[in-house]
Amino acid sequence: MYSAGQKILMYHLACVNCGATFPADEIIYNCKKCGHLLAVRYPLDTLSVKRETWNNRPLSVWRYKELLPVTIPPITLQEGGTPLYHLERLGKEMGLKHLYAKHEGMNPSGSFKDRGMTVGVSMAVQLGKKSVACASTGNTSASLAVYAAKAGIPAVVLLPAGKVAVGKIAQALMHGAKVISIRGNFDQALEMVHELCLSHGLYLLNSINPYRLEGQKTIGFEALDQLGDVPDRFVLPVGNAGNISAVYKGFMELEELGFIDRLPMMTGIQAQGSSPVVRAIRENLPEVIPEKNPETIATAIRIGAPVNAEKALSAIRKTGGLAETVTDDEILQMQRDLARKEGIGVEPASAASVAGIRKLVQMGAIDRNERIVCVVTGHLLKDPDTVIKQCEPPIEINADLPSLLSALHL
């Protein structure tokens, strides 16, 4: 790995809109010239890395450290290396031979956010920040609390009151974060925490932070290594749109390095009640129109003004991808199907990606011969209340065999 001095000189921040560049160690979250989003840029033409080097390391986020900005020993809990499951039964039902699910719920805090937080919190330490903060629909707060605890620095999280699954709040509280519940929605919480970080020096670790997204791009790297080839289509639930943006950026870097010769079709799935990105794609809008009151059972993607919409629209359009909505009923049905037909337990938002593929197949919008990777983003136990509401309660019986046989209809 490069020494700290060498590596800091080898990457910088760049505006995705006007191209303005900024030093790697400047703490900014938007372009100072035009206000648009930033991305980390590496001089890939001079980067000394080989696929064989990666292949000799364990499958994890840090397998790909040459394409990550951290120069200190990372704050890590061995995140990444999540399983890629072949969905044989569901694929057969849909007429798809090559349908896969990348189960990000198997990360340390139970969601894909850990990939971003291992890098983001490591960067906070590297940059000398003493505290970190985020707004969250749940998973970001849980992950930030976990990694801040590992780093030994305070964390502040803002949540929309009454709109975060109990499992996620429990994680943030148990790991010692200062949890603030606001009477408002996620977008308002994000605006507040952004202002807090700018005015009081906390390090913001929402997906507006370009360094956090660097960790999340490794989902695509791992899927490529696990499949042995570039998938034809990469499907993700879309909330704040950081994940689809990050994975797309990662694949572009691999293409520029000559490691792959094509990009997957980036496909974003949103809940019908929270779908500004889908609307922008359908209506060919240059940017998303924020939704003031997004609503869906899938709390993790209940976001009306996605921060990374600009990057997400580019990812979908430039790869010939698709964007589609699914109803809450379709999401919950797929959550049950993944559990009962494939043995994969996910939270509602996670099921959106596979539910979206089912819908696209029914619409005749995709080739059934495609090799498709669906990212399922969080674990079943993130939102146990939604699970309990869907299922029949346990059958209570007397403690004797006849009662048991009767309950089992035997």
What are these regions (language model features)?
Residues Y2-L410:
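PLP-dependent amino-acid enzyme catalytic core
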